[in-house]
């Protein structure tokens, strides 16, 4: 089992920012079309994180032209160029699946306010 642990440790990324459910992210994804490759930005809020270690994933949801789009990314995937945290969300749940049914202003997530200490 120690061999698998060492392989997993070698595959971990160390440039992943700290984020949780409710945060708004910009995920820069490498898209390969034939011989060309480009970076596509997917911006939305985090519905939740699942798993641990190399197998950890997170789901990002956005509304594009009135249609909800969800995409699940492995945290340590090589196709992810970088992850940017745009805003921190103020939520009380680890999974925000209830947001799928909300529309309009009800689907807004409050922004977490940081007070200087």
From Swiss-Prot:
<comment type="function">
    <text>This protein is located at the 30S-50S ribosomal subunit interface and may play a role in the structure and function of the aminoacyl-tRNA binding site.</text>
</comment>
<keyword id="KW-0689">Ribosomal protein</keyword>
<comment type="similarity">
    <text>Belongs to the bacterial ribosomal protein bL19 family.</text>
</comment>
<dbReference type="GO" id="GO:0003735">
    <property type="term" value="F:structural constituent of ribosome"/>
</dbReference>
<dbReference type="InterPro" id="IPR001857">
    <property type="entry name" value="Ribosomal_bL19"/>
</dbReference>
<dbReference type="InterPro" id="IPR018257">
    <property type="entry name" value="Ribosomal_bL19_CS"/>
</dbReference>
<dbReference type="GO" id="GO:0022625">
    <property type="term" value="C:cytosolic large ribosomal subunit"/>
</dbReference>
<dbReference type="InterPro" id="IPR038657">
    <property type="entry name" value="Ribosomal_bL19_sf"/>
</dbReference>
<dbReference type="InterPro" id="IPR008991">
    <property type="entry name" value="Translation_prot_SH3-like_sf"/>
</dbReference>
<keyword id="KW-0687">Ribonucleoprotein</keyword>
<dbReference type="GO" id="GO:0006412">
    <property type="term" value="P:translation"/>
</dbReference>
<dbReference type="Pfam" id="PF01245">
    <property type="entry name" value="Ribosomal_L19"/>
</dbReference>
<protein>
    <recommendedName>
        <fullName>Large ribosomal subunit protein bL19</fullName>
    </recommendedName>
</protein>
């Amino acid at each position: 089992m120690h061999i698998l642990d060492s392989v997993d440790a070698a595959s971990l990324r160390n440039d992943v920012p700290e984020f949780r459910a409710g945060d708004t992210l910009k995920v820069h994804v490498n898209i390969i079309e034939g011989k060309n490759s480009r970076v596509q930005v997917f911006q939305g809020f985090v519905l939740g994180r699942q798993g641990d270690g190399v197998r950890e994933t997170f789901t990002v949801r956005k509304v594009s032209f009135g249609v909800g789009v969800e995409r699940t990314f492995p945290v340590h995937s090589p196709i992810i160029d970088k992850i940017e945290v745009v805003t921190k969300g103020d939520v009380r749940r680890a999974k925000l699946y209830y947001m799928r049914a909300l529309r309009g202003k009800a689907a807004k997530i409050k922004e977490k306010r940081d007070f200087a200490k």
